[in-house]
């Protein structure tokens, strides 16, 4: 067996020490410790054909270090899995530099760029990165075109409130699709699904929030094969109903100890 080099031992020690200090600080704030993404199984797709996927948030509030992102990308490369990561508004909620760090890191490791349409077709196999963006930050996404082109990246845009988007921004979405990116649904009004179902019923949730968000995109020519839950909020009952209408669902994982994730176990 090859002996570990001293430099690697030192880096591992520093990483472990840094994680310990971060957990102690988190405890003083009353929040859970951030887990190593490389040990967060729910964000890795291993080709098992699942219909409900889970991604981890890249936004600043998640406080993911580059070392933690490296751990996730390294695992995907080593095990032939697809790591799922999402974000929202470039610059406002997530630094463009962090987006580039992930995309560049995937390219350097030889990871394929996988969309949720690929998952729906059964072709989303690893090693790979499934990067997605939620909500309506279309101009910000559009400004990432050169970055994506530089690394040959393909991503998925889960768009909410599409019926309220007009003119130039719809043209931007068309161009993003023409570039090879996936356009998917994210509800009409970005409401919490389980709360809506509890108050109004399942039929109303499908009628008011889910199906129109799919149909309005289809009317503009997009083959919509995936749906992302706002806030990742879901139940098995809602999953079953939605999977009658669309093949792939995306929730989220909260990678902190003591914090309950909506991701299926």
Regions found by a protein language model. Name each.
Residues 51-109, 219-220:
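Catalytic grooves of carbohydrate-active enzymes
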Residues 10-21:
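Bacterial N-terminal signal peptides that target proteins for export
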Residues 35-36, 50-54, 80-93, 120, ...:
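Metal-dependent polysaccharide deacetylase catalytic core of the NodB/CE4 family, i.e.
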